[in-house]
Amino acid sequence: MDFLEFTHRKEIYTYKNTILGYTIVVDFAGKGKITYPDGVIVNDETTSNLTKNENFVVLECVYRLLKLGYKPECIELEPKWEAPHDIGGGGKADVLVKDNAGESFLLIECKTWGKEFDNYWKKTEQDGDQLFFYAVQKRSTKYLCMYASNWDNDELVRKSNIISLKDNTATLESFDEPISFEKANDKSSLFAAWNITYGKYSFKNGIFEDTCIPYLIEEKGRDISNITEIGHDDIQKKYHEFTTILRQHNVSGRENAFDKLVNLFLAKIVDEIRNSDKLQFYWGGPQYDDYYKLQDRLQVLYKEGMEQFLGEEVSYIDESTIEETFKLFLNDPDATKDTILKYFRQLKFYTNNDFSFIDVYNEKLFYKNAQVLVQMVKMLQDVKLVTEKPNQFLGDLFEGFLDDGIKQSEGQFFTPTPIVRFLVSTLPLEEIIKSKGKSYIKNVGLCMWSWSFFK
């Protein structure tokens, strides 16, 4: 509460915004009571007490919205509708944000950090669950958000998964029979639009950050601060995600898949080093990105990585280079340019390349592979590979992918990482360097077979 700039007298904490003229009062006596500012509509007292941890998340969410400039009269808590038995929450949404005309603009479902948030988001991805039920009740809603906040290591951390319910014309035109948000009239059709047309795309920032403007919700450009170092608990999740993607798309060539994964690692490392202020390694969703732009960005990063780290020149011409070349021919009609670009796209994308998890030799297979590629990129885009200090978990992650991706046959067996660590720690490397110099050590074979030669 002190971090949120509440002042307190005994058990009563108060936040006053003298500029906008509103007050939030939290009384910790007894079961606790939260008094929201005048103008905020409170339909039920369920979230206005301190008996549940989720209520603290709702409190912090409302505080943050007000702090960013949303007016109290545009915020409504716990609007309620008759809900089927499979919808949790009793048919009550946590926070509804209305626009200046009083229409529903944003629906927010607050969850506690960790398991509850993850479980409910999984349900959302399965059938739409609470969020899509609420959205059908308020069809003017433009955005849905699942939100959590937590106090961790003396710092307030926030997590949000945001879904846009606004249609994208270009995306709809790419389907023969598109399913749109606009024409959806029930939960299943609204979810089908998100699931099929927009590939369940969600983004993680655009509402609660310091730079956000009320009612201007859009994914902000990603920078190095948006990604985090991997921890022990994340490793198994990434293994499972990797194998799930391969299984879902019937990718049988594990060794090829691992090769392409290594290429993605290389592209991501280059991105973090060269584009830390504006990362390029991410999937921006079908409403803002497309498969061609994504692969073009990845190829440019991969080309730079091969040249910088491996000294290998990779032939690749990106889209912007072609655009610039055409500017030299001012008298050429646009039709000629479009035709040549079409042929160029076929040659560049509709063949096997450095990110082909499956064989690609036509447009249909390009799109099929692109679906795999997008999921692989999403798996890695929030992981920080370039760290200031060695990250053992990152090494363990790569080792796990290696074990899973490369068939171990005679002469190819990989020694488990703990054994390798033990072997290296027992080598008298420091004494050897002191007595014979650094140039003496040429190579160290970290496998059980080579160990017999050291002995």
Per-range role (PLM):
Residues K31-P37, L96-I108:
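Active-site beta-strand-loop-beta-strand hairpin of nuclease catalytic cores
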Residues A101, C110-W121:
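Short beta-strand-loop-alpha-helix junction that forms the active-site gateway
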Residues Y198-L279, W283:
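Non-catalytic accessory regions of SAM-dependent methyltransferases
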